[in-house]
A protein has these predicted regions:
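Class I S-adenosyl-L-methionine
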Residues: 71-72, 76-162, 521, 534, ...
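Short, hydrophobic/amphipathic alpha-helical patches that form generic packing surfaces
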Residues: 56-75, 135, 240-247, 520-524, ...
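Signature of N6-adenine DNA methyltransferases within the class I
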Residues: 154-155, 185, 192, 235-236, ...
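Active-site-adjacent bridging/hinge elements
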Residues: 34-47, 126-141, 161, 206-218, ...
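Structural motif
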Residues: 47-65, 121-125, 325-327, 508-515, ...
C-alpha cells in the first residue's frame, strides 16, 4: 500500500520548504538561464513584472508535478495526454527539449516520489488536489498581488448550494476565474455522485456507469462545466484536476478537449472561447481576483476603463476619488462583466467577494446600483452571507462574503443578509436585513439591522446637527511636524522632531522654535473611551482661516526660527505627493484638514479606523512649557467643535452609546478606513445640545463621571448602562429594542 493521494500530502511532499523542491527549482533556474527557451519570452507576456528566472523556474516545477500527477492518477503518459492537446500550447514543457542530465534526473526523482502515492479509485470524493500545493509553492505576496486566495472546500460547497446546483447536466455552469479548478471539480463531483447512485439503483452493487453511459456522461460534463482563467499555469492545473475528477470514465484512446480556456474573462468577454456559438450559462460561480484598482497594472487599468464606465462602476467626482473613494476592487468588474456577457436572463451568479462591496462609501456606490449600466439589465441580489468573523482565508485578513444574484430582476429590499460567526461545532448564522441607508440613493452603503427588529430604518437614521472634521494632516511628513518639546530656551522652546514617524525617513534635529506655533498633539493611540492625553507636540504653521500655510513672508519675519526649522526640510516637504498635486503654489510647509475647528478649545475626539466609537472630551491642556493650549488631534482622529464643557460631555456620551455604535457598525466597516469618519454623522441623529433638556444634562453628567472613573482606573459599566438608557430615550426606543441593539 502506498501513500494516500491527498492535497495536503502533496503540499507536504513538494512544498516550498522541502529539499527536493529547493533543489528542483534551482536546477530549472540554471537551465532556463543557460538555454533562454522561447517559452520564456511567451511566459513574460503573462508575467511582465517578473525579473530573472526564479518565478519561471518555480512555475515550470509546478507544471512538472501537474504532468506527473495526471500520469499517476489517470494512467495517461505525457505523450498521450499532451500529444492529444490536452493542455494546448504548453509554456512549461520547454525542459523536455533541453538535453541536460540534471533535468532528466530531476524528472525521474519527482516521478519516483509521485509513484509512492496510490491513485485514488474512481468514485473517490477527491477534490482540488493542486490548489494547496500551488499556495504553498508560490510566495504569498505574489499570490495576493494577483488576488489569488485559497478557497476552502466548505466555502466552495456553500457557493454551489446558493445557486441550488445539484447534478443536472442540462444546467450549464461557468467559473470565469477558475484558478486550479476548485469550483469545476466540486460541480463534477456532484454530477458523478448522482450518476453512481443511478447506476447502483439500476444494477445493485455496481456504482460504475456502463462504458457507453460513461462516455455520454463525460460529453455532457464537458458541455456543462466550463472554466476560464488568464493565468496559463492555472489553466493547466484546472485541466489536470478536471481530468483527474473523470478518471476511469474516459476511454484512454479518447481525444479530449477539457473545457478550460486561457482567457481574460473581462477584456475578452466579446470574443468566442470555443468553436461554435457561445451560449450563455445558467450559473456563474467562483472566487474572482480581489485586486484594488490602484494595484492593477497601468495598462490593464487603461484597457478596462471603458468597461468600468459602461457599467457605471465609476460614480465619483475627482475630489471624492482623491480622498479614497477610488479604492475599487477588480471583483466588481468581474461580477458585472460575467453577469452581462456570460449569464443568461434569469440565470444566477454566486461568488465569493469582499464584504466591503456592500458598505464601502464611495468606492462601492456604482456597484450597489446593481444594474448593467444606466439603461442596462437589473441584477437582483437575493442573499448575502457575511463571513468576516469566520475568516475563511486563514493567511489573510480579507473580509469575506458571498453574493447571490439573479439577472434580469431588480433588487428587492430588504435583502436577506446572514452573519456567520464561530460556534461550538457548526458556525452560528444570524439573520439580518440589508437596505440602502439612503432610500433615494440605491448606491449608498447598506444599512444592516437584525431581522425582526421592530424599529424601522427611518426611526434610527437621521442627519446630525453637528459637523465633524478630520484632525491635522502633515501630508506624510509627521517626522517633521511632530516634535518633542524638551525645555525652555533663550528665544523659545527647544524641540526634537520625532524622526521615526511618517511615511518618509527624516533626519533627527534639535532646534529652538517660537512657542506660539507649538501645540499639544493627540495621536491615535492617545485617544480612548473617556480619556485623551497628549503624548507629543505639533508645529501648526497653518492659517486656520484661509486654511493654507501661513504667508511665508510673515512666517519668516515673525517666526524666523520656526521658518528656519522647516526650511531645512524644504526638499522633503516640497516633494510630498499631496503638496505637489494640490498646493504647489502655496507655502511649502502647508498642511491639510486644518481650520478654526482644529484649534477650538473644547472638542469631542474619537479615533477613526477603530472597531467601535471611543470618544473623549478634550479641553485646554495645561502644558508645563507652553501654558494653556488647545490640543490638536492628528488626521487619524475625528473631532467635533463644542461651545461648552457641558455640550462636549453630552455629545461624548451619545457617541459612546450602544445605539450610536450599532448605527455606525450597521452602515460602515468595523476596523476599516471608512469607520468613524466625519461622514458618519450624515446618518447619526446627534441633536444639538439643549441645556433645557433634562436628558442632555444627565448625559453630560454621566460623561463627566465616566471620564473621572476612567482616570482612576475604575470600570464604567454601570454609568454606561445609564448612558445607553438615556440615549435610547432620545431615539424613542423601547427597552426590548435597546437590548436587541
Amino acid at each position: 500500500m502506498g501513500k494516500e493521494l491527498r492535497a495536503e500530502n502533496l503540499a507536504e511532499q513538494f512544498g516550498a520548504d522541502t529539499s527536493i523542491t529547493k533543489r528542483g527549482v534551482a536546477v530549472l533556474c540554471r537551465a532556463a538561464a543557460a538555454a533562454e527557451p522561447p517559452a520564456l519570452a511567451n511566459w513574460k507576456t503573462f508575467f511582465p513584472d517578473a525579473d530573472g528566472y526564479d518565478l519561471f523556474a518555480l512555475h515550470t516545477y509546478y507544471a512538472m508535478l501537474v504532468r506527473l500527477l495526471v500520469e499517476r492518477c489517470c494512467g495517461i503518459g505525457a505523450d498521450d495526454s499532451f500529444g492529444n492537446g490536452l493542455f494546448g500550447d504548453d509554456l512549461f514543457s520547454w525542459y523536455a527539449s533541453v538535453r541536460r542530465e540534471p533535468l532528466q534526473r530531476l524528472n525521474n526523482q519527482l516521478a519516483a516520489k509521485m509513484a509512492e502515492y496510490d491513485p485514488p479509485l474512481p468514485g473517490h470524493p477527491g477534490g482540488d488536489l493542486l490548489q494547496q500545493l500551488y499556495h504553498d509553492l508560490v510566495p504569498r505576496p505574489l499570490r495576493h498581488e494577483l488576488g489569488e486566495y485559497y478557497t476552502p472546500d466548505w466555502l466552495t460547497q456553500h457557493v454551489l448550494d446558493q445557486i441550488a446546483y445539484t447534478s443536472d447536466t442540462n444546467v450549464r455552469l461557468l467559473d470565469p476565474a477558475c484558478g486550479s479548478g476548485t469550483f469545476l471539480v466540486a460541480a463534477i463531483r456532484r454530477i458523478l455522485a448522482t450518476a453512481r447512485l443511478d447506476a447502483a439503483e439500476q444494477q445493485p452493487g455496481n456504482e460504475a456507469p456502463a462504458p457507453e453511459t460513461s462516455t455520454e456522461l463525460c460529453r455532457k460534463i464537458f458541455a456543462s462545466v466550463v472554466g476560464f482563467d488568464l493565468n496559463p499555469l492555472a489553466v493547466m492545473a484546472a485541466k489536470a484536476n478536471y481530468l483527474i475528477a473523470l478518471r476511469g470514465l474516459l476511454p484512454k484512446s479518447a481525444t479530449v478537449e477539457i473545457p478550460v480556456y486561457l482567457r481574460d474573462s473581462i477584456l475578452a468577454a466579446d470574443r468566442p472561447y470555443a468553436d461554435g456559438p457561445d451560449e450563455p450559462f445558467d450559473c456563474v460561480v467562483g472566487n474572482p481576483p480581489w485586486i484594488a484598482w490602484d494595484n492593477l497594472p497601468t495598462e490593464y487599468r487603461r484597457a478596462s476603463l471603458p468597461l468600468w464606465q459602461r457599467y457605471g462602476l465609476f460614480s465619483l467626482s475627482g475630489t471624492q476619488g482623491r480622498h479614497g473613494g477610488s479604492k475599487k476592487d477588480l471583483a466588481m468588474l468581474m461580477i458585472y462583466t460575467a453577469a452581462d456577457r456570460y449569464l443568461r436572463d434569469g440565470g444566477r451568479l454566486a461568488m465569493v467577494v469582499t464584504q466591503t462591496l456592500f458598505q464601502n462609501k464611495g468606492a462601492g456606490d456604482g456597484f450597489r446600483r446593481f444594474r448593467l449600466g444606466p439603461e442596462g439589465q437589473w441584477l437582483g441580489v437575493l442573499r448575502v452571507d457575511d463571513m468576516v468573523a469566520l475568516r475563511p482565508f486563514h493567511d489573510t485578513a480579507n473580509r469575506t462574503a458571498t453574493l447571490l444574484l439573479e439577472k434580469g430582476t431588480p433588487t428587492q429590499y430588504p435583502v436577506p443578509y446572514v452573519k456567520w460567526s464561530p460556534g461550538d461545532g457548526a458556525p452560528r448564522q444570524l439573520a439580518y436585513e440589508a437596505e440602502p441607508i439612503e432610500p433615494s440613493n440605491p448606491g449608498s452603503p447598506w444599512f444592516l439591522r437584525p431581522a425582526g427588529l421592530k424599529t424601522t430604518r427611518e426611526r434610527l437614521v437621521g442627519r446630525s446637527d453637528y459637523t465633524a472634521h478630520l484632525g491635522a494632516n502633515s501630508g506624510g511628513a509627521n517626522g517633521v511636524y511632530w516634535v518633542e518639546a524638551l525645555e525652555r530656551s533663550r528665544g523659545g522652546i527647544l524641540i526634537r522632531n520625532l524622526a521615526g514617524r511618517g511615511k518618509r525617513a527624516v533626519e533627527e534635529v534639535c532646534r529652538v522654535v517660537e512657542p506660539e506655533l507649538l501645540y499639544p498633539l493627540l495621536r491615535w493611540g492617545d485617544v480612548s473611551r473617556y480619556r485623551a492625553t497628549p503624548s507629543a507636540h505639533i508645529l501648526l504653521v497653518q492659517d486656520v482661516v484661509t486654511r493654507t500655510g501661513i504667508d511665508e513672508t510673515l512666517l519668516r519675519r515673525r517666526y524666523a526660527q520656526t521658518h528656519a526649522y522647516f526650511e531645512q526640510f524644504g526638499v522633503l516637504l516640497r516633494g510630498r505627493a499631496a503638496y505637489r498635486r494640490y498646493q504647489d503654489e502655496k507655502p511649502f510647509y502647508s498642511m491639510y484638514n486644518v481650520g478654526t475647528y482644529t484649534v477650538a478649545p473644547i472638542k469631542v475626539v474619537w479615533r477613526r479606523m477603530d472597531r467601535r466609537i471611543n470618544a473623549a472630551v478634550v479641553e485646554p491642556v495645561e502644558d508645563p512649557l507652553l501654558g494653556t493650549r488647545p490640543a490638536i488631534p492628528q488626521e487619524t482622529c475625528v473631532l467635533i467643535e463644542c461651545g461648552s464643557s457641558d455640550e462636549a460631555h453630552y455629545a461624548c456620551a451619545v457617541l459612546n452609546s450602544s445605539v450610536v455604535n450599532f448605527l455606525v457598525a450597521a452602515h460602515s466597516i468595523s476596523g476599516g478606513k471608512g469607520f468613524g469618519t466625519p461622514s458618519m454623522l450624515d446618518y447619526i441623529r446627534l441633536q444639538r445640545f439643549d441645556p433645557a433638556d433634562r436628558r442632555h444634562l444627565e448625559l453630560a453628567a454621566c460623561s463627566r463621571q465616566a471620564h473621572r472613573l476612567t482616570a482612576e482606573g475604575v470600570a464604567t459599566a454601570i454609568v454606561q448602562q445609564l448612558i445607553d438608557r438615556l440615549v435610547g430615550e432620545l431615539w424613542g426606543l423601547e427597552e426590548s429594542e435597546l437590548r436587541t441593539l
